[in-house]
Amino acid sequence: MIIRTSVALYAGTGTRFIARTGTGHEMVLDDDTGDAGARPVELLLVAQAGCTGFDVISSLREGAQVVTRYEVSVTAEQRDEAQPAIYTRAVVLHEVEGPALDEEVLRRAIYVSATKYSSVTAMLSAGTVEIHHRYRIVGPAGAHPIEAEVMVTGPHADPDALGQPQASGAAN
């Protein structure tokens, strides 16, 4: 499958661009000197969050989990000692609320997204990024949240090997 994306120069000041996706959606891009839109490197993290987020929430619903709030955030570190300032480490945190959430269903949803379904995870993990896949289950007010790491993917992972049986200690 071929996906087409184009970027056109915005007729204005600064270095703003309008990105038009193959599905016809547009977004404003800017560099670090402006504030008109997202920086391209930020969009990698948005893509990571969106791709795994769709996978995980779909799996939770298929697993009959009642989710009252779901948020996925990605925090990443860039190297600063050399250019390009590539991402080297990221933490993907899935924060979930709901009555009687099954922790194992959540762990499995995150694992399957990270190893089988998330194209963005596969691409970033094949490159330079070590990605920590974590979750936090938020309970009723006053209760301590449950937090854990499901797995780590990358760096330099073979995208075809993601989802294959791993050595002892791997989550599934």
Regions found by a protein language model. Name each.
Residues 48-52:
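Alpha-helical metal-binding/catalytic segments enriched in His/Glu/Asp
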